[in-house]
Amino acid sequence: MGLGIALAAPLAVAQSAPSSQPWMDTALTPDQRADRLLAQMSEDEKFQMLRSYFGLGTDKIPKPEGALGSAGYVPGIPRLGIPAQQLADAGVGVTNPGGIRKGDYATAMPSGPSTASSWNRQLAYTGGKTMGRESWQQGFNVLLAGSVNLQRDPRNGRNFEYAGEDPLLAGTMVGESIRGVQSEHVLSTMKHFALNDMETRRNFHSAQIGEQAMHESDLLAFEIALKIGDPASVMCSYNKINGVYGCEHDYLLNQVLKQEWKYPGYVMSDWGGVHSGSKAALAGLDQQSAGEVFDAAVYFDAPLRMAVSAGVVPRTRFDDMVRRVLRSLFAHGAFDHPTQRQSIDGKAGLLAAQRVAEEGSVLLRNEQAALPLSKDVRRIAVIGGYADKGVMSGGGSSRVDYTINGGNAVPGITPTTWPGPVIIHPSSPLQALRTALPNVQIDYLDGTDRTAAARAAKAADVAIVFATQWAAESVDLPDMRLPDNQDALIETVAKANPKTTVVLETNGPVRMPWAERVPAVLQAWYPGIGGGEAIANLLTGAVNPSGHLPVTWPVDESQLPRPSIPGLGFKPAKPGEDSIDYAIEGANVGYKWFAARKLTPRYPFGHGLSYTQFRMGGLRVDARGSQLTASFEVENTGPREGAAVPQLYVALPDGHATPLRLIGWQKLTLKPGEKRSVQVVAEPKTLADFDAKARRWTIAAGTYRVQLARSASEPVQTAEVTLQAAQLP
């Protein structure tokens, strides 16, 4: 179909609604309402629900009439009361690419690893709720959030959108965020289904992995997020999985997602992820995204019409596609709570973002109690990282350009085009430190002159070096090094002043050749629009750090399953028959890989320091059928209030391929001297294996060693429990 015809297709007929619209009866279930509405739709109206338009337009294709200016747009059908679908990116805030919507701004939330580092379910929910509310207030009823891909490699350019390496932690935290988004009557996606764990050649490469390993790692994260969050839509991924494109993957979309997991929502494609019409529809894809711009054809228009007419795609499947979209619109409030454009509460959003950054920043190292900053400090040298202007953020479709504090604080950093521009959010740690410490002289140097930086550091009581690393969608990092000779800057400053603290604003783990030469390191990730204030509060002790790593921090690339991956770096992806062999580690992602290979990381999964101390003990474990319950006590033995994150791991019976699994955790805030009893029920599937032949989860009979731990590498107490063989429902 020609482009002009395609753009003329939307049906926005201005007719009065019928006097009787039974599908608007809120006493009915979403399924019943969808069935009643589907029965009244014409074939053209049905097809209208199965493709979105690019909501921004291009230099050749104008922005669709009615679109607010965003990632996608599906016109409504007024005669039936069907609302338009206004789709906005993404998972760290409502985007406004290039300021296309004049005056619109949103809260730039901290990155996914920051939220995950909080290990705080309620905080993840609240962050999602903030994004959902701002989406709704800006007129968007679909938010392309819910990124739950596992972080298999620290060089993945999109790790800043994800929630770590463990399926239980990632699935739980992203599921809670999705639940928060949808509490504001905004549909959320869950993405990118599945194994979209690297960006290099993402449109072409094949993720190779066994079925059992896939279910016990990436798919388990999706399954847990699905159970908790009930996302309206699942976005299929660009890449191939075992040679089959994600949006044509019958096994993943039909057999696993819709049949085994009984998912009632709809599957939408990623932008540019569709390669066929009937094949994709039969494999489980329900809605094509902006095909007129990103795909070779609008497969879900003329090609799908022909396939339905010819019986290649049965009408039952065609109706099922439409019904799933309608059901999600009913289930998550798009019909009953239409959006009302209004001003957002930017100050409330900033405070929400700041709280996430405070709980999600991780104190990696703190020798000789270097932090919090001593009250005796009279002069501080702050060096590097744009700390005088703001904090780093990630690039690509999730980039939030405009916040309550304004636009980019440092325009012109390359790249300035996709997946840039590089955005420095205007939240200056330097200014926040000066506000918090009015009687301290705080000098700033940008770090470009290492000699001057060393001179300033030597003259100060304390030096604080801010180091940044930009990462973005569609490209991977070439290696784990900090860019722009920042390692040399840190070495120089630390040599000049042994009381040097390093604050990292990075996509994830980086090499730290200087780690033993600085007393303190704070990992702030991409801390969002409240990041400057959060960092200052953590450094000064106004806030006690409580973040714990959601990923293992390798010493360098030699400890990774794939030390070298050809083609990584900031360069365009090229077509090819490439594959990534995830079978190397299989389900042993992150700390499981390190445990299996007996490797010692720089910092283990779950690691995080505090300004107080905690004692854990009294572990008792009870098993009844497939339910394992652990009880223990936690006491704050230090001088100030703080939050502990006791973690529970299980070492499976001898001979098992996976040596260790996180089975649960609890985050609790305790006053000095306070002791509390805690009970944690393990997620049953963390105790089980996926039987690929029988297509079910089974618990093997044997002795399981449950560890109460501070991190994956620091068990405090172990208790054994015997489990009987069982099959999970």
Indicate residue ranges for each PLM-predicted region.
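N-terminal export leaders
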Residues: 1-3
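Glycoside hydrolase catalytic-domain context in secreted enzymes
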Residues: 14-690, 698-714, 728
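Extracellular and select intracellular beta-sandwich modules with Ser/Thr-enriched
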Residues: 715-719
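Short beta-strand edge segments in extracellular beta-sheet folds
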Residues: 720-728
